[in-house]
Amino acid sequence: MVEFELSAHAKSMMTKRKISSDWISRTLNTPDKKRRGDDGNMHYTKSIREREGGVLHIVMNTDVQPNRIVTLFFDRRLAKQK
């Protein structure tokens, strides 16, 4: 299980975008894809069936402890590529 905290921005986006904590856990623990971005952060993506297969994209700073989710959103660009 990935340990993390949410930034203030991520908490706000979670509420605004109606992203459940279960979806966050599933994305971090069993991502469809995981990569280090050019920004140095880890990017996790996962298709969420409850959102008609929308792709949840989580950006996490792994250089701090505990790891911090910087932002999270449903990535329309990735959903189109499916």
Where are the language model's segments positioned?
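Ribonuclease/tRNase effector modules and their secretory precursors
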Residues: M1-K82
